[in-house]
Regions:
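Juxtamembrane intracellular "pre-TM" segments in multi-pass secondary transporters
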Residues: 1-8, 180-222
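Helix-loop boundary and gating motifs at the non-cytosolic
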Residues: 2-52, 215-255
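Cytoplasmic helix-loop-helix junction between adjacent transmembrane helices
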Residues: 103-141
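Helix-to-loop junctions at the C-terminal end of transmembrane segments
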Residues: 57-70, 154, 263-278, 365-366
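Structural signature of the two symmetry-related core transmembrane helices
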Residues: 73-87, 280-295
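A late C-terminal transmembrane helix in Major Facilitator Superfamily
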Residues: 337-369
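Intracellular juxtamembrane helix-capping segments at the cytosolic ends
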Residues: 31, 111-124, 319-335
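A membrane-interface helix-boundary motif in multi-pass transporters
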Residues: 154-167, 363-387
Length: 401
């Protein structure tokens, strides 16, 4: 494979993303369970809240200023900012300090992630659906390794965990730097056809205009709601499992979810056909999420239902995430929008959902503890998932009429 080929460049990006996601997966369950047991579920959720608050601010800036999604130095620098901020967590004991540093790390993530996705879209002749599926696969492969490492290491070695995490982010920055150099060289070497004002030079030309312009706002709002709900297990599993299923390692459910995605993502991505197929996959993803929450509400202290719920949660992401990316990208293409800014806008709404959802999850878990009804932390999200599905179905029916 030629070092300048788009496929090679995509693999560089995917390798870097896998390193970063592995680092995040390595520390998150360990830190959340440690803080949750030592302080409260609200403080544990506050760390994710701070992370997503920073991502929200970063993605907002990236959606307004193209330098953050186009310039190699800005993308690489913000990756290093995130890694350095996370490393400093190894030396902070106060939960408020952890929240503050998590916010700074989130800022770096929110500024760099849209640029990474935009870089993928600048690759010549690459199929967009496969690129997004490959990105999801890289994220999950890294997460699988990170969760497995976390299960083996445990929460008593956090300095070592964060040292490894820093090295992984340095690796991500290096791979992204190499990839961006290749993309910049390709943009110079390949003459560009005239493009619409505001579109991204060098982006993959095969992205279909699968979503009419009027769908964008509805998709972004639904995406915020979806991630509001999807973030619930990230918080609640870390708090629920040590208390109610103590025989199960806290990272196991995350690992099961990740391995399921790895096994199915590329196969499932080939199935949808056109806009209708991708919209159907969004609905299937929401149904799987609701089923996962309902299973957890009935799980009690049994291991098997917890693992089944982890598989269902994985299926929700397998069906939902790549299809949403394809629909948003298709809409941006149809309207001649800057892809980098569009990706940043999508990330803004996603982080808004995750930020508010993480705080809600921690507060809901604490309330469930006070009431002595642990199922409350799962039955409320299950009901909300069905409400989201109904709203989406009604919206799509209205558009057809």
């Amino acid at each position: 494979m030629n070092r300048r080929s788009p496929a090679f460049t995509a693999r560089l990006i995917f390798t870097g993303v896998a390193l970063a996601s592995g680092g995040i997966a390595f520390y998150v369950p360990l830190l959340l369970s440690t803080v949750g047991l030592a302080h409260s579920g609200a403080w544990a959720a506050g760390i994710l809240f701070g992370t997503n608050l920073g991502r929200l601010a970063g993605s907002h800036l990236a959606s307004r200023h193209g330098v953050f999604t186009q310039r190699r130095g800005a993308i690489v620098g913000n990756i290093l900012l995130e890694g350095a901020a996370l490393f400093s967590m190894a030396f902070i004991a106060a939960p408020a300090g952890l929240v503050a540093v998590a916010t700074l790390a989130g800022l770096g993530s929110g500024l760099s992630f849209p640029g990474m996705k935009n870089a993928l879209m600048r690759l010549q002749g690459m199929d967009s659906a496969r690129l997004f599926a490959g990105l999801s696969l890289a994220l999950r492969l890294g997460m699988a390794m990170g969760y497995l490492a976390g299960a083996l290491v445990g929460a008593s070695h956090l300095v070592a965990v964060f040292s490894v995490l820093l090295a992984m982010f340095v690796g991500y920055a290096a791979f992204m730097d190499l990839a961006m150099r290749g993309i910049e060289a390709a943009d110079v070497d390949v003459p560009q056809a005239p493009i619409a004002v505001g579109s991204t030079p060098g982006a993959a030309a095969d992205v279909p205009a699968v979503a009419p312009p009027s769908d964008m706002t509805a998709m972004l709002l639904m995406n915020a709601a979806f991630w509001f709900l999807t973030i619930q297990p990230t918080v609640t599993m870390s708090l629920y499992v040590p208390r109610y299923v103590p025989g199960l390692a806290v990272s196991t459910t995350y690992w099961v979810t990740t391995v399921t995605v790895l096994l199915l993502q590329m196969r499932v991505t080939r199935l949808p056909r056109g806009a209708a197929g991708h919209r159907l996959f969004l609905a299937i993803g929401i149904v799987c999420m609701a089923a996962s929450f309902a299973t957890m509400a009935l799980a009690g202290s049994h291991v098997a239902p917890v693992l089944v719920a982890a598989v269902l949660l994985a299926l929700s992401q397998v069906f939902y995430s790549p299809s949403l990316d394809v629909l948003v990208t298709g809409d941006a293409r149809a309207r001649g929008l800057d892809l980098g800014k569009t990706m940043a806008r999508q990330l803004f709404w996603q982080n808004l959902g995750m930020m508010s959802g993480s705080l809600f999850a921690g507060a809901l878990f604490d309330q469930a503890l006070r009431l002595g009804t642990p199922s409350l932390g799962w039955s409320v999200p299950a009901t909300a998932s069905m409400a989201l599905l109904a709203a989406w179905a009604l919206g799509m029916r209205g558009k057809r009429n």
